[in-house]
Swiss-Prot record:
Organism of derivation: Hericium erinaceus
Keywords (A to Z) from UniProt: Glycosyltransferase, Transferase
UniProt family annotation: Belongs to the UDP-glycosyltransferase family.
Name the record gives this protein: UDP-glycosyltransferase eriJ
Keyword set includes Glycosyltransferase: yes
EC annotation from Swiss-Prot or TrEMBL: 2.4.1.-
One Pfam family hit: UDPGT
Catalytic reaction(s) noted: 11-O-acetylcyathatriol + UDP-alpha-D-xylose = erinacine Q + UDP + H(+); 11-O-acetylcyathatriol + UDP-alpha-D-glucose = erinacine Q2 + UDP + H(+)
CDD domains given in the database record: GT1_Gtf-like
Length: 506
C-alpha cells in the first residue's frame, strides 16, 4: 500500500440532487482505494446541509463496509446559502477554503462545474501542483448535445459576446439578455444525436420558456467543463454509452484534452445495515404501513410513486391536478412527494377527494430508494432527473416520464423511446413544449382535456395491461442487469474510479 496520503477537497452545491451523488461517489472512491492508495477527503458543505450530509455519508460508508468516517472524511461547514451567483458564495467559500488548506493542501479538488469561478481560487491558492476535477451530476453527453447548450459548449466566448451585444442593442439587464440570447438558438431545427431518434430542438424545453434554469448558471457550468483537468459525471455507461464516446472525442479536441469518467449509478449499496436504516425512516413516516397494506389488498406492483425532485413542480399545475384526478378515477394508490405549501394549494374538491379516497399518501419527503425497492411499487412518475432515473432503473421499476427542464427531456426520451423502460406523458407541456416533436411525430395540444385523455391511456396501460408490462419488464431487466454490474470488480464505473485514482497519483 502506498505510504503517501492524497488529500481531496470536494465542494458540492447544497441542492440535494447534486450533493448526495457526490457523497456517494466519494465513499465508493475511498472504498476502492483502501488496498492501494491512502485517501482522505475534506467535504466543504453549506451550513444548512451539514447534518444531512453527515447522515448520508454515514449511510454510504456503511454500504461500503466502512464503519468510521473520522479517519478518512472531514465535513467542514461554510456560510454559503446558495452556490450561485459567484458573488453570493465566493467570499465565504474563499474564507473556508483558506482555513482548510492551512491544515493540509489538497492534491485534487472535485468541484461542481457550475462553481467555475472558484476553480481559479483553488489554483491560485496552491503552493504545490493541484488538479481540478469538474463534478457533473447530469446526463452530460446527451444534454450538451441539445440546442442551445451545444452551441455554448463549442464556443462559450461567442455566446458571452452575443449577450453583451443583446444588452447594448436591446437595453436589457444581464439576466434578461442571457435568456434572450440563449433562446435565440432554439428555432425548430432537427437534431441528429447518436443514440437518439431524430428530435427538434424544441424538445429540450417541455415546460419553457420562460426558462426555469438561470442561463448564466449554465454558462458557468460550461466554462467549468472546458476548464477542468478531468470530468467526473454521475451518468452511467449503460445509459449513455454512445453519447459518452462522442463527448469524449469532443473533449479530447479541446485545449485541456481532458478525460471524462462516468461513475454512475450511485444508488446506495443495499447492505443489511443500510436496509435497516431505510426501514426505520420508512416505518417512522408511515410509508411501510401504507405500502404493506396496498400490497396485501391489490398485490405487488400496484402502487405508483410520484416525485418531481426537490426544486420544482410542473409549470402548468392544472396538468398535475388532472393527472391526480385520473389516478383516483382508476383507483390507483399512490405516494406523492408534495411540499406543505403545494398541498395547501390543492383545489378544495381535489383535496377532499384525495383525503376521502384512502388511496393516497401525500408527504413533503420520502425515502425514495426504500419505496422504489418495495414490492408494492409498480411504477415511478418522475421528472427524470439523473438520480431518480438511475435509482428506478437499477431497482427495476418502470417510469412514467414527465420532464421539466435541463437534462430531464433527454433522459425521458432515453427511458421511454430508446430503451423502452417506461412511457412518456407527451401532453403535459407548455411553451416550446407545444411545438412539433420529431421524435414522436406529434404536436402536443397541452389542454387539460388532452392531459386527462392521455393520462387515462398511459396509466391504464401501465397498471392493467399485462402484455405491455411484460415488454417493459424485459427491457428493464436488461438495463438493470447492466447498470447493477457497473461497480462490480470488472465494472465500468469501478474502472472509472480506479482511473481517477491513477490520475490523482500521476
Amino acid at each position: 500500500m502506498s505510504t503517501q496520503n492524497y488529500h481531496i477537497v470536494a465542494v458540492p452545491p447544497n441542492e440535494w440532487g447534486h450533493m448526495r451523488p457526490m457523497i456517494a461517489f466519494l465513499a465508493r472512491l475511498v472504498a476502492v482505494s483502501l488496498n492501494s492508495v491512502d485517501i482522505t477527503v475534506t467535504l466543504i458543505i453549506a451550513e444548512s446541509a451539514v447534518a444531512k450530509a453527515r447522515t448520508e455519508l454515514s449511510i454510504q460508508l456503511a454500504g461500503e463496509g466502512i464503519q468510521s468516517a473520522e479517519s478518512r472524511f472531514e465535513v467542514v461547514p461554510t456560510a454559503v446559502h446558495m452556490f450561485w451567483p459567484a458573488d453570493a458564495y465566493l467570499p465565504a467559500l474563499k474564507a473556508t477554503y483558506a482555513e482548510v488548506i492551512k491544515k493540509k493542501e489538497p492534491d485534487f479538488a472535485l468541484l461542481e462545474s457550475m462553481i467555475h469561478p472558484f476553480f481559479d481560487v483553488v489554483r491560485s491558492s496552491a503552493t504545490k501542483p493541484i488538479k481540478v476535477g469538474a463534478w457533473l451530476p447530469v446526463a452530460l453527453p446527451s444534454w450538451t448535445s441539445m440546442a442551445p447548450i451545444c452551441y455554448i459548449r463549442d464556443d462559450p466566448q461567442a455566446y458571452v459576446k452575443q449577450v453583451e451585444t443583446t444588452m447594448a442593442e436591446k437595453g436589457l439587464g444581464y439576466m434578461e439578455a442571457a435568456s434572450d440570447a440563449y433562446l435565440s438558438h432554439v428555432n425548430g431545427r432537427v437534431l441528429r444525436i447518436p443514440g437518439f431518434p431524430e428530435m427538434t430542438d424544441y424538445e429540450g424545453f417541455p415546460q419553457e420558456p420562460p426558462v426555469l434554469l438561470p442561463v448564466a448558471m449554465v454558462v458557468d457550468w460550461v466554462f467549468g467543463i472546458r476548464d477542468a483537468d478531468i470530468l467526473v459525471t454521475s451518468t452511467a455507461q449503460a445509459l449513455e454509452r454512445q453519447g459518452l464516446q462522442v463527448f469524449s472525442k469532443w473533449l479530447k479536441e479541446q485545449p485541456k484534452h481532458s478525460d471524462i469518467l462516468a461513475v454512475g449509478p450511485l444508488t446506495s449499496q443495499r447492505t443489511p445495515e443500510v436496509a435497516r436504516k431505510e426501514k426505520e425512516e420508512a416505518d417512522a413516516g408511515g410509508f411501510t404501513a401504507f405500502l404493506d397494506a396496498w400490497a396485501a389488498k391489490k398485490g405487488p406492483k400496484s402502487v405508483l410513486y410520484i416525485c418531481f425532485g426537490s426544486v420544482l413542480l410542473p409549470a402548468e399545475i392544472e396538468h398535475l391536478y388532472a393527472v391526480m384526478r385520473v389516478l383516483l378515477e382508476l383507483q390507483i394508490p399512490f405516494i406523492m412527494v408534495l411540499s406543505d405549501a403545494a398541498r395547501a394549494a390543492l383545489p378544495a374538491d381535489l383535496a377532499a377527494a384525495v383525503r376521502d379516497s384512502g388511496l393516497v399518501k401525500l408527504t413533503p419527503w420520502a425515502p425514495q430508494q426504500y419505496i422504489l425497492a418495495h414490492a408494492a411499487v409498480g411504477w415511478f412518475l418522475s421528472h427524470c432527473g439523473i438520480n431518480g432515473t438511475l435509482e428506478s432503473l437499477c431497482l427495476r421499476v418502470p417510469m412514467v416520464c414527465w420532464p421539466l427542464f435541463a437534462d430531464q427531456p433527454v433522459l425521458s426520451i432515453l427511458v421511454a423511446q430508446v430503451y423502452g423502460c417506461g412511457y412518456e406523458l407527451g401532453e403535459v407541456r407548455k411553451g416550446f413544449g407545444l411545438k412539433y416533436r420529431a421524435s414522436t411525430g406529434k404536436t402536443p395540444g397541452g389542454t387539460v382535456e388532452d392531459v386527462t385523455r392521455e393520462a387515462r391511456e398511459v396509466f391504464s396501460k401501465a397498471f392493467f395491461n399485462k402484455a405491455e408490462r411484460a415488454k417493459v419488464d424485459a427491457n428493464l431487466e436488461k438495463m438493470a442487469t447492466e447498470l447493477n454490474a457497473a461497480w462490480d470488480a470488472e465494472g465500468d464505473a469501478r474502472a472509472s474510479a480506479l482511473a481517477l485514482l491513477d490520475f490523482i497519483r500521476k
